[in-house]
């Protein structure tokens, strides 16, 4: 049996099984909002959802999914009764990366992928299947967008814009997207193709709102989402659970932390840590561009761990973080393991993520929680250990002194090139 055929059968069976046992429980608060938005779309149309829905602060792509759900439901009563089936949308995107990479002929990743190790990971599925949140949608789109841009920049940009209009957090990967575009786009024609694809995608996504003169509503919703939870941490067991005495949720991030505010301090730590993480990838992409070389295995392995660390830094240092904002790192660390054969970062982050989700929703899994192991600071220490371990691996392989020296040489070579 061909590997692609085997993958299709196994993934179809896994998807069908998960659908069959799809939990009826979900986040009452989140689904309360989504039911309100679904009824607002049903009554007033999708272009008016930001004006009639209660606290609508999600981007259009997820709202289009709610609209599609509305279309499939014949009456208001069915919309209300079957709202739990909205979980199917994020579940589809949980499967999307491995379906694309394992069920079809492609050149994005040529390695053998143990896809069941991702798909049957309860930490990976919990966010979609139990909670019913939508982080898997933008996570999978960002992953596929950045990989695709290595070969087809215009298509990659289209996918990335879809990710951005699903969740604003996609912006954390924007510097990597710019670096890949700088490596891949080498002519004015290629640049124009990317620009046209970008403008066309944004226009299509916003078209219903543009037609009704409601495009500003989307922008206002994005602004509204910023500082929606102005707390030091919202159940994200990150560095602030180790630095703040008491409960970080009870502390506003506008308060002073030594000299700066908590928010400013977290943002600076994120920018510095992510900036250092980007140096090896920048050097590698510039080297490949100067040598007119195609993407290779080493680049993709470096890309995966870089993306995972950027997401981890975003979650670990910034304020206002929820526990589920680490979700994209699971995909990145899994595919880093596919290349490196080192599954330790993926396993560690899966354990920490599952513990944090289970602590947030203690009634979902039949787990007897140990008060010490499942304490907030214990989970924060596990996240810290995972980040430190992964950074040690990263900087052992890519020593900053060497990377900076080589980057300076390449920049001089690029500047001197006629």
State where each predicted segment sits.
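Aromatic/glycine/proline-enriched transmembrane-helix motif characteristic
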Residues: 21, 98, 226-316
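Transmembrane helical bundles and short interhelical boundary loops of multi-pass, membrane-embedded
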Residues: 22-23, 211-215, 219-232, 262, ...
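Extracytosolic helix-loop segments that constitute the early lumenal/periplasmic catalytic or substrate-binding loops
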Residues: 32-64, 68-77, 214-223
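Transmembrane signal-anchor helices characteristic of membrane glycosylation enzymes that use polyprenol
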Residues: 2-36, 44, 91, 120-121, ...
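Perimembrane helix-loop-helix junctions
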Residues: 1, 172-200, 210-214, 328
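Specific aromatic-rich, kink-prone transmembrane helix
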Residues: 100, 137-154, 332-333
């Amino acid at each position: 049996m061909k590997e692609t055929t085997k993958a299709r059968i196994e993934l179809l069976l896994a998807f069908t099984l998960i659908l069959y046992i799809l939990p009826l429980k979900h986040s009452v608060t989140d689904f309360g909002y989504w039911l309100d938005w679904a009824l607002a779309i049903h009554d007033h149309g999708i272009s008016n959802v930001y004006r009639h829905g209660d606290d609508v602060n999600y981007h259009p792509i997820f709202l289009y999914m709610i609209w599609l759900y509305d279309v499939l439901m014949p009456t208001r009563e069915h919309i209300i009764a079957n709202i739990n089936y909205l979980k199917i949308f994020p579940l589809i995107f949980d499967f999307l990366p491995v379906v694309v990479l394992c069920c079809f002929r492609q050149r994005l990743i040529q390695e053998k992928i143990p896809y069941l190790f991702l798909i049957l990971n309860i930490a990976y599925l919990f966010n979609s299947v139990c909670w019913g949140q939508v982080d898997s949608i933008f996570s999978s789109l960002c992953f596929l967008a950045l990989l695709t841009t290595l070969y087809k920049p215009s298509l990659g940009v289209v996918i990335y814009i879809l990710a951005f209009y699903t969740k604003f957090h996609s912006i954390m990967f924007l510097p990597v997207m710019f670096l890949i575009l700088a490596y891949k786009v080498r002519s004015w024609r290629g640049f124009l193709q990317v620009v046209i694809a970008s403008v066309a995608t944004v226009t299509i996504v916003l078209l219903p709102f543009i037609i009704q003169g409601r495009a500003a509503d989307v922008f206002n919703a994005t602004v509204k989402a910023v500082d929606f939870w102005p707390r030091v941490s919202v159940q994200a067991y990150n560095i602030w659970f180790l630095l703040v005495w008491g409960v970080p949720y009870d502390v506003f991030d506008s308060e002073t932390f030594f000299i700066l505010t908590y928010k400013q301090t977290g943002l600076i730590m994120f920018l510095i840590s992510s900036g250092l993480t980007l140096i090896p990838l920048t050097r590698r992409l510039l080297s490949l561009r100067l040598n007119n070389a195609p993407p290779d295995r080493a680049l993709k392995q470096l890309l995966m761990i870089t993306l995972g660390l950027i997401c981890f830094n975003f979650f670990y240092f910034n304020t206002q973080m929820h526990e589920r904002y680490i979700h994209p790192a699971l995909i990145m660390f899994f595919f880093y393991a596919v290349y490196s054969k080192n599954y330790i970062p993926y396993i560690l982050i899966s354990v920490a993520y599952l513990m944090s989700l289970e602590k947030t929703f203690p009634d979902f899994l039949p787990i007897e929680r140990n008060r010490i192991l499942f304490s907030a600071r214990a989970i924060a220490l596990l996240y810290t250990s995972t980040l430190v371990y992964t950074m040690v691996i990263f900087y052992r392989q890519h020593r900053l002194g060497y990377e900076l020296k080589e980057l300076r040489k390449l920049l001089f070579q690029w500047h001197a090139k006629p």
